[in-house]
């Protein structure tokens, strides 16, 4: 083809029509294998879920081609009239879901949403209060390796040793002592409800902003089955996956117009450039799904299933931190059995039950070893598991853990093989994307 001539039409036809399996069989194979893993394994990672085919379609749409720096009606690029529709729908649906006045749907993750709040409300070196990571907090709430722990001065509150519930007396004492600019409620491993009204009272007493990170339980809030951060919080952030069952991403919510402007500026141009419009469209689809009556039924089942799973594991002789759960997750404390989270995660994985090792309050083990595992019910509930199935899952987990307790970290191969067979029989009854 000579210089200056049009691209060969055969090449163009292939570019626009060839499927992934034709153009990149290695990636196509990896995706196919991951679909098989999701179909045949029981997913109990509390931060994971399974999205609808409609969400997949939106995220894989031509909106991936469009740059749209700025906000709807105020873009720095032309040709944004249709992606504006998608973002405006996402914003409107988010506000309806959570009963708030303002929503920023552009954060690429929950971590970036949290960073945006920090940028808007604090200066480097300012003090904030958050739940200790070891007690169920989150990396972005002041862990030393995270930017939140490097740029700011985190002060951590924890849970009471006797019942593993938030120590509100300690929260109040630390707030009075350190006078933080921001107080955070929320975390990644706390299975109980939060006293948002009391947190706001404490924040007001020291002139602090009250910030709720509801990444894990936002879907339960949207369904009206978990206390809402509003009207207590000055700001709330969330991921859009987990219990909200959307694409991976983040969001900032508030009722304060002045703060909303600060959050918008913090996200763009403060932290991000062009937003991911295909992901924002997928967020809008998921929010639309969450506004339907069926989502409330789903969210209630998530909670019922979590309680059934926790009760079954307790009946099997294992401890659950705080004695149970109010939401979608639980921490299994393995200390009295002499087990580690690392060994438990590996053994369950061999039986095709997926979870993650997790620290428990006052854990003597290193974060890479841990004394517990975290379990969650959103993904398996999405595929149709009910209370009966989760009781069976709990029994299977106990069998695998007992095998480690009896035979060491290598586990009981015969038990794990038998459990794996039962896992496949169960997952075959509940296909995904069939």
Swiss-Prot record:
Keywords: Amino-acid biosynthesis, Cytoplasm, One-carbon metabolism, Pyridoxal phosphate, Transferase. Signal peptide: none annotated. InterPro entries: PyrdxlP-dep_Trfase, PyrdxlP-dep_Trfase_major, PyrdxlP-dep_Trfase_small, Ser_HO-MeTrfase, Ser_HO-MeTrfase-like, Ser_HO-MeTrfase_PLP_BS, SHMT-like_dom. Pathway: One-carbon metabolism; tetrahydrofolate interconversion; Amino-acid biosynthesis; glycine biosynthesis; glycine from L-serine: step 1/1. Gene3D superfamilies: Aspartate Aminotransferase, domain 1, Type I PLP-dependent aspartate aminotransferase-like (Major domain). Its EC number is 2.1.2.1. One of its GO terms (molecular function) is pyridoxal phosphate binding. GO terms for biological process: glycine biosynthetic process from serine; tetrahydrofolate interconversion. It is found in: Cytoplasm. Catalyzes the reversible interconversion of serine and glycine with tetrahydrofolate (THF) serving as the one-carbon carrier. This reaction serves as the major source of one-carbon groups required for the biosynthesis of purines, thymidylate, methionine, and other important biomolecules. Also exhibits THF-independent aldolase activity toward beta-hydroxyamino acids, producing glycine and aldehydes, via a retro-aldol mechanism. Belongs to the SHMT family. Homodimer. This is Serine hydroxymethyltransferase. It comes from Methylorubrum extorquens (strain ATCC 14718 / DSM 1338 / JCM 2805 / NCIMB 9133 / AM1).
């Amino acid at each position: 083809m000579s210089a200056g001539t049009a691209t060969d039409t055969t090449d163009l036809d292939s570019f626009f029509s060839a499927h992934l399996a034709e153009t990149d069989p290695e990636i196509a194979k990896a995706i196919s294998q991951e679909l098989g893993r999701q179909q045949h394994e029981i997913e109990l990672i509390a931060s994971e879920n399974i999205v609808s085919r409609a969400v997949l379609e939106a995220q894989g749409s031509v909106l991936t081609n469009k740059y749209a720096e700025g906000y709807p009606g105020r873009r720095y690029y032309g040709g944004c009239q249709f992606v504006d529709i998608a973002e405006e729908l996402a914003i409107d649906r988010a506000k309806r879901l959570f009963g708030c006045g303002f929503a920023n749907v552009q954060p690429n993750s929950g971590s970036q949403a949290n960073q945006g709040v920090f940028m808007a409300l604090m200066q480097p070196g300012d003090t904030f209060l958050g739940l200790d990571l070891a007690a169920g907090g989150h990396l972005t709430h002041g862990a030393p390796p995270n930017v939140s722990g490097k740029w700011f001065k985190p002060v951590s509150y924890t849970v009471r040793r006797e019942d593993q519930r938030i120590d509100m007396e300690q929260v109040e004492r630390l707030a009075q002592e350190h006078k933080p600019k921001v107080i955070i409620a929320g975390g990644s491993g706390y299975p109980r409800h939060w006293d948002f009204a009391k947190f706001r009272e404490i924040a007001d007493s020291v002139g602090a902003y009250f910030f709720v990170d509801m990444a894990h339980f936002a879907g339960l809030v949207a369904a009206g089955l978990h206390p809402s951060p509003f009207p207590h919080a000055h700001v709330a952030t969330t991921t859009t996956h987990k219990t909200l069952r959307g694409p991976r991403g983040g969001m900032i919510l508030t009722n304060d117009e002045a703060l909303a402007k600060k959050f918008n500026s913090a996200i763009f141009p403060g932290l991000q450039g062009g937003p991911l419009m295909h992901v924002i469209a997928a967020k809008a689809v998921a929010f639309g799904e969450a506004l339907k009556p069926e989502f409330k039924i789903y969210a209630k089942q998530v909670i019922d299933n979590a309680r059934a799973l926790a009760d079954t594991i307790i009946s099997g002789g294992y401890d659950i931190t705080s004695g149970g759960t109010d939401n979608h997750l639980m921490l299994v404390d393995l200390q009295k059995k002499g087990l580690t989270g690392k060994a438990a995660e590996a053994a369950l994985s061999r039986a095709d039950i997926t979870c993650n090792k997790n620290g428990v309050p006052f854990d003597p083990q290193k974060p890479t070893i841990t004394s517990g595992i975290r379990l969650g019910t959103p993904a398996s509930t999405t595929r149709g598991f009910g209370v009966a199935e989760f009781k069976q899952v709990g029994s299977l987990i106990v069998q695998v853990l007992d095998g480690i307790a009896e035979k060491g970290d290598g586990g009981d191969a015969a038990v794990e093989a038998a459990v794996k067979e039962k896992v496949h029989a169960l997952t075959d009854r509940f296909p995904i994307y069939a």
